[in-house]
């Protein structure tokens, strides 16, 4: 049995505190673009390694930088003047010694990485011309000797932690968290883009709850080729606002809602227009790990890890595995009858099996009529089950079935 500790969460339930702030950066935000590319590159490398070598080899591709380009904006359609520059860096296993033949096997790391980055951009930014609007530069290098050695030495056994670090998670999502998350998903959904094509992918949703009132302040890029006048632009905002308000009704749970879109606009002179759907075309830079946490949100009223989850290897890198695992455990613990709220923290120790954390800390707020003592064994059972099946978490990541930002 792992070192699992269960205790009462000594705080007011999140939905009852007077003020709550929640943020989500949409898939077209420069930071989220970097997160998405980093994770897509990692997943592609995992698949390439398994195809070529039968196992996932060591890599960390969590160092993606975006340098903003420059665009000439015009109602009815502008153009890019200077392309967005994206740098792929990090470390990956590029050569493997075949112990049976004694030959060095060279692996197509950089080709795989560039193709994955371009495929992701094509999927995420529908108005970007990949031939003209962006430059993808790959500078991924060979992995650290020490880290590769730890990875290779342990890969046929239980993976061992490559760092002393921690992951955190919480569940269930608060009303504000649900609305912020679902609002961005709505605005970047295929259905909404088909109905309102002028809505770009660079969307940021900031949620503020004061008592029973939730205010959403939304920054929403518009694509200039679909906007022929300022009146068109105002209409796009009004249509999007109506969609957000209608969608939010499913999650409001008695709260009042106010939706504000592009509050910096001066509808005569200053509006949020883009050519490609992202502010990365206008000098906004981006980096991995500066945006959403592993659960897709930025939650200053909850515990958060500063680790960038996207792009890290899914076998031994605690910054990835334990953050994702913490959220999975929290979600399952929160499903136990009598658990109102749950927070998870998992701490590793470098070189130790990932199934044996130094501590797995569970904090819970019981529902009225339930005692911590009766909930504790059930929560421990959930946590131990996931530690025993941690390879399932890795498989979800490698398959691309886990959200990391």
Swiss-Prot record:
Its EC number is 2.5.1.6. ATP binds at residues 141-146. One of its GO terms (molecular function) is methionine adenosyltransferase activity. InterPro entries: AdoMet_synthase_2_family, AdoMet_synthase_3, S-AdoMet_synthetase_arc. Disulfide bonds: none annotated. Its cofactor is Mg(2+). Keywords: ATP-binding, Magnesium, Nucleotide-binding, One-carbon metabolism, Transferase. It catalyses: L-methionine + ATP + H2O = S-adenosyl-L-methionine + phosphate + diphosphate. GO terms for biological process: one-carbon metabolic process; S-adenosylmethionine biosynthetic process. Catalyzes the formation of S-adenosylmethionine from methionine and ATP. Belongs to the AdoMet synthase 2 family. This is S-adenosylmethionine synthase. The lineage of its organism: Archaea, Methanobacteriati, Methanobacteriota, Methanomada group, Methanococci.
């Amino acid at each position: 049995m792992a070192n699992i500790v269960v205790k009462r969460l000594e705080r007011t339930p999140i939905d009852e505190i007077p003020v709550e702030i929640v943020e989500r950066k949409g898939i077209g935000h420069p930071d989220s673009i970097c997160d998405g590319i980093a994770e897509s590159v990692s997943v592609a490398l995992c698949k390439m390694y398994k195809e070529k070598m039968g196992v996932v080899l060591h890599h960390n591709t969590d160092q993606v930088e975006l340098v903003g380009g420059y665009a000439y904006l015009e109602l009815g359609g502008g153009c890019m003047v200077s392309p967005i520059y994206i740098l792929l860096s990090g470390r990956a296993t590029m050569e493997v010694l075949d112990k049976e033949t004694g030959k060095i096997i060279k692996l197509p790391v950089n080709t795989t990485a560039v193709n994955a980055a371009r495929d992701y951009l094509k999927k995420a930014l529908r108005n970007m011309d990949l031939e003209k609007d962006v430059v993808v530069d790959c500078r991924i290098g060979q992995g650290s000797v020490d880290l590769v050695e730890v990875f290779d030495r342990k890969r046929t056994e239980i993976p061992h932690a490559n760092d002393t670090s921690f992951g955190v998670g919480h569940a269930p999502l608060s009303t504000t968290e649900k609305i912020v998350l679902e609002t961005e998903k709505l605005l970047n959904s295929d259905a909404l883009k088909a109905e309102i094509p002028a809505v770009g992918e660079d969307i940021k949703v900031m949620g503020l709850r004061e008592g029973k009132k939730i205010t959403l302040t939304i920054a929403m890029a518009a694509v200039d080729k679909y906007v022929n006048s300022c009146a068109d632009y105002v209409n796009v905002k009004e249509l999007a606002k109506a969609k957000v308000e209608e969608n939010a009704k499913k999650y409001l749970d008695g709260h009042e809602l106010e939706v504000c879109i592009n509050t910096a606009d001066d509808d005569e002179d200053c509006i949020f227009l883009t050519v490609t759907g992202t502010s990365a075309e206008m000098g906004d830079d981006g980096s991995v790990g500066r945006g959403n946490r592993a659960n897709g949100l930025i939650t200053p009223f909850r515990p958060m890890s500063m680790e960038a989850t996207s792009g890290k290897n899914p076998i031994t890198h605690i910054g990835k595995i334990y953050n994702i695992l913490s959220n999975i455990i929290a979600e399952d613990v929160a499903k136990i009858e009598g658990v109102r709220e749950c927070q998870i923290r998992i701490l590793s120790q470098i070189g130790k099996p990932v199934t044996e954390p130094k501590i797995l800390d569970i904090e819970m707020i019981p529902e009225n009529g339930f005692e911590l003592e009766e909930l504790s064994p059930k929560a421990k059972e959930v946590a131990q089950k996931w530690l025993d099946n941690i390879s399932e978490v890795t498989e979800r990541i490698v398959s691309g079935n886990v959200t990391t930002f």
